[in-house]
Amino acid sequence: MNASANLCAASANDPQPGDQEAAHPVACAGDEPAAFLPHDLPIFLVGMMGAGKTTIGRGLARALRREFIDLDHELEARCGVRVPVIFEIEGEAGFRRREAAALQECTQRRQIILATGGGAVLAAENRQALRERGIVIYLRASVEELFRRTSRDRNRPLLATADPRATLRELMVAREPLYNEVADLVIDTGSMPIATLVKSLLPKLQAYEKK
């Protein structure tokens, strides 16, 4: 039995909480009037695991009345299992193939906020799609801040190592040039409250013109 067949078997036997929600992302609503953008370009969030892509993405979606999609959750909905299970059955190469296929589809949608996985920028075709199809925001955080945010998260297969802090540092060295390569805007997340970050992002997005 090949890896894909194994994954299908795992999917059928081990449904995961939240899959239904992930499979049907809906536009977020809020009490404040929707912020205005002079374009319908999708907004793509890139950055390391723990940078705040999902949390900030949801905040932006609420402010802009846009649909929010988390690429990892989209993959989990399609496969029926969590990301660590995909890694376990198909390895990182198999996961990256699935990730690339989902990213190519999602980046063609208009008026969405898409939170990508930390390693989505590794593939050249992914970077090209991100650069050409929307506004890319690199959410930047220090290794220490990333470690603090991810140290208790068991849903991070790449950090299942003897020294997760050192692993984060190595991943940052390899990936940061790629984040900067695709980024239209770079935002330091630090310890700033999410609402403040989102509020500071809105005028930058309103003023931005895609080159």
UniProtKB/Swiss-Prot annotation:
Q: Where is this region: Disordered?
A: 1-24
Q: In which pathway does it act?
A: Metabolic intermediate biosynthesis; chorismate biosynthesis; chorismate from D-erythrose 4-phosphate and phosphoenolpyruvate: step 5/7
Superkingdom of this entry's organism? Bacteria
Q: Does the keyword Kinase apply?
A: yes
- Which keywords annotate this record? Amino-acid biosynthesis, Aromatic amino acid biosynthesis, ATP-binding, Cytoplasm, Kinase, Magnesium, Metal-binding, Nucleotide-binding, Transferase
What is the stated purpose of this protein?
Catalyzes the specific phosphorylation of the 3-hydroxyl group of shikimic acid using ATP as a cosubstrate.
User: What's this protein's name?
Assistant: Shikimate kinase
Q: What is the lineage of its organism?
A: Bacteria, Pseudomonadati, Pseudomonadota, Betaproteobacteria, Burkholderiales
